[in-house]
Every structure is written in structure tokens, then in C-alpha cells.
Amino acid sequence: MTRALLSVSDKTGLVPFAEKLVALGYELVSTGGTHRVLAAAGLDVIAIDDVTDFPEMLDGRVKTLHPRVHAGLLARRDLPEHMAKMAEFDITPIDMVVVNLYPFKSTIQKDGVTEAEAIENIDIGGPSMLRSAAKNFAGVLPIVDPADYDVVVDKLQSGSIDADYRKSLAAKVFQHTAAYDALIADYLTVAEFPNNLTLPYEKFDDMRYGENPHQKAAAYKTALPEDYSVLNANILHGKQLSYNNIRDADAALRIIAEFEETTVVTVKHMNPAGIGQGSTIETAWDKAFAADDVSIFGGIVALNREVDAATAEKMHAIFLEIIIAPSFTPEAFDILSAKKNLRLLTVPFTTTVPQKLEVTSVLGGVVVQERDLYTESKANFEVVSKVQPTEAQLRAMIFAQKVVKHVKSNAIIVARDGQTLGMGAGQPNRIDSVVYAIQKAAVKSGFDEAVLASDAFFPMDDSVQYAAENGIRAVVEPGGSIKDKDSIAKADELGIALVFSGTRHFKH
């Protein structure tokens, strides 16, 4: 008779599956709570301590860690010496293991959970049985996911369980136990950058393709999800998010989290196209749209206030890929959902993004750093010019600094009164970014109180000179160049304000 060992925390589908195994001729062995559930259902099931001839002990910490269990799992059926040794010790082979693990993840997500509670939910016996079964998949079926129960039964009934399917179940086990261990390691780790980096992710979706149609792609989210994330957004309307949609929406969420004020952010290819602030969400939209009414076409929009009907009517008039907001009024939703392909997402707005490690792939490995969550403040500004910036210019500098950190370096932002006017992004030469940003801004009505912000220092005074000669009256940059004195002298010569923020914001 074939034997199946069942020991599960998640009892979903357990009894029907076990009943079908019995009908297929399986003898059932089980542990603890699983044994009680199966027995209560009227199934003939052998208790694990009747197999091991040893009682469960240490509050259930030791149940299946026994040679009679693991020999039954690890013995190779194709080796006569293995089977002879099994017979010598009267050990029955185990042909199937059905195990899912203690709920460590859900335990540590509970409010007020103690370390002791978390540790008690670290499974030892379960992973050991799964790994033994998965190692010996040629002779043992390892099943870790209740979603596989029906498929396994169908294949057993049809006799279609082949080597490839066995191998796929084994791979699933090792993926599952690796993720389980990674989550535990992450929970217990206190080092900022441990010697071995284990980051558990769970598949969110298979993408139609990646950045381009010839690239395969999938999306994964962290095992402990962040509420403020496009991967945990509520999709109210529209089709599946693409790879590029997710990247752009993520960029929009990162930018808008900088602002408590009523703000609208538009994004194209992960750079802000236009940002506007106003007393209402409609006026904020008007300013964001006016900031760049061309680049916004086919873009992503994020708003940090509820979308009303008036704002929805204006957004409906142009082609957009995604609109993200905390909520939509019923009227706004009706207006926008009339567009079949427009994705409408809700995400709970926050300005408190948690500090996490950012992982970037490079050939042969990854580089890891903290998120850039530096908070801009006038208290950290140093006015280095003779001309003092006005209060309006200082406010614009704070706004522009919050934006420029999210623009691909070399990054320049021209801004005024809660509105971006021009952006220079991704140029290898900083002066080229300065020129482009000012040229973009020049189509707006004048530069009164407009400021220019740079993500990094000016290596020479040409950026200050170009800004001043083209109507900019105040500049903010980190400082730190060996030629800072030249930029300061040029600002004084041309009568503009120059402020050092003291903080660089490269973005690659």
C-alpha cells in the first residue's frame, strides 16, 4: 500500500483531498491538529507517534524529526541496498508528503506580536520533511500548495504523473522553503547590510512583456507588502498593468509622497512631466497640465486628494494611461471609466514612506542602498550670495528640491509657486540640462520669483551665468565643488541669489 503523510497548518481542501487519496489506495499518516481533523471526518488515519514509536514532545516542537520518517522519505526505491536497510528496520516508505508550514508571515504581521510568538511559529519539522521529499522527488510526491491538490488527484487517477511533473513539485517546495527561510532571516537580521542578502518576494503578476515586446517579464511584491505601492493598489477600472505602467506609477507615487499640499504629479518614462499645487485638486491639475501639456499625452497622473467631477472632465479630455488617487467621487469615476483602456487605481496617500533597501541589478550581482528619503528644509539652506532670496523664492526652492531628486541625473528643475516650469533630465553635461530646462520654462509667462534647482553641484560657473542671463533670479544647488567660489562670484556679479542645500540627489 502507498503511504501519504499529511501535516498542514492551512486546512483548505484537506478532507476532500484525503478522501480521494484513500479512494486511490493511500494509507494516511498524520500529526497533531491535522490528525484530529481527518479522524473527525471519519477517515482511517495513523498517528505519527505510532509510526515513530515515540511521542510528540516539547510542546509539539518534536514530532516528525525521526529516522522512521526521514528514512521513509529519503530511501531511493531504485537502490536495493536502501530498500534492504528499510526492511531491516521495518520502515515503511512514504510516497507522498503533504505539508504547509507554520504561519510565520501572518504571525509577524499581527499588531503587537512578540519575538517569542514569532519564534514559536518558525516551522522546523515541516521544511525538513518537504526538503527530504523534494530531494527524493523521483520516488516521493512533495506537495506544499493546496492549489495543487486537484491536479495531483487528476494525474494520479489518469496515471500521468511523470518525471517532469515530479520535478516541478520539487522545485516549488525548494522555492517555498527558501522564501520561508528568507522571511525569517529578514525578521531576525539586525545588520543593515548582511553578508548574505535574502529578500523574499512573491509573484504578483505575469506581464505580457517587459520594457519592450521582445522581453519576458513578471512582477513580484515583497512578502510583507507595503500598503503604499502600485503593486497593492486597488484597480477600479481598466486592463492589466504593464511593466512600464508599474515603473511609471511607482515613480509617480514616490514623487507625490513628498508633498502634504494638494498636488498633482504627471509622469512620463519615470520622469516628472509636470507638477502643480493648488487650493483645490482642480487648480492643482490645471497647473500640472500647464507645466507640460505635450509630454503628459499617454502619461501617468497621481493626485493626493479625491478626484472630483470637474477635475475628471479635464483629465478625460486627453489620453492618459493611469490615474492614481486616494479616491474618486462617483461622478468622477463615471466620467473616467467611460474610457475602456484607462486604468483607475486607488492607493492610500501618505508622506511617510518607510525606509527600505533599494536593490538594483548589475551584471553579476546587485547593489543595495537606502531609499533617498531626505526631507528638504530651509533650516538646512545656506545663502552664499550677497543677494538674499525672497520668501517666495525659498518656498519655490523647497518645492523644486523635492522634485529634482526624482529626476534622472544630471537633473535641473525650474519652478515657481508650486509649479514646475521646465525640466532638464539625463544629460551627461550639466549645462545642457540647465539650458534645456530654461528653454522649456521660457515658453511660460516670465520668470518672476522662478528658481532653478540642481540635483548636484555646478562644476563651474557657466550654469549660474546662463541662468542669470536668461531671467532666473535665484538658484539652489548642493554645493561641494572645488569651484564653488566661482559660482558664488558669478552670482554676486550678476545679482542673483545662490543657496547651497548641502545635500546631493543623484538619480541613475
Curated annotation (Swiss-Prot):
CDD domains (UniProt xref): IMPCH (cd01421)
GO cellular component annotations of the record: cytosol
Keywords: Hydrolase, Multifunctional enzyme, Purine biosynthesis, Transferase
Domain note: The IMP cyclohydrolase activity resides in the N-terminal region.
SMART domains: AICARFT_IMPCHas, MGS
MF terms (GO), sorted A to Z: IMP cyclohydrolase activity; phosphoribosylaminoimidazolecarboxamide formyltransferase activity
Name of a matching Pfam family: MGS
The name this protein goes by in its record: Bifunctional purine biosynthesis protein PurH
Source organism (scientific name): Leuconostoc citreum (strain KM20)
Enzyme nomenclature, EC number: 2.1.2.3, 3.5.4.10
UniProt GO BP: 'de novo' IMP biosynthetic process
UniProt pathway annotation: Purine metabolism; IMP biosynthesis via de novo pathway; 5-formamido-1-(5-phospho-D-ribosyl)imidazole-4-carboxamide from 5-amino-1-(5-phospho-D-ribosyl)imidazole-4-carboxamide (10-formyl THF route): step 1/1; Purine metabolism; IMP biosynthesis via de novo pathway; IMP from 5-formamido-1-(5-phospho-D-ribosyl)imidazole-4-carboxamide: step 1/1
Signal peptide coordinates: none
SUPFAM superfamilies reported for this sequence: Cytidine deaminase-like, Methylglyoxal synthase-like
Record-linked PROSITE patterns: MGS (PS51855)
Domain MGS-like: 1-144
Family, per entry: Belongs to the PurH family.
NCBIfam families: PRK00881.1 (NF002049), purH (TIGR00355)
Annotated catalysed reactions: (6R)-10-formyltetrahydrofolate + 5-amino-1-(5-phospho-beta-D-ribosyl)imidazole-4-carboxamide = 5-formamido-1-(5-phospho-D-ribosyl)imidazole-4-carboxamide + (6S)-5,6,7,8-tetrahydrofolate; IMP + H2O = 5-formamido-1-(5-phospho-D-ribosyl)imidazole-4-carboxamide
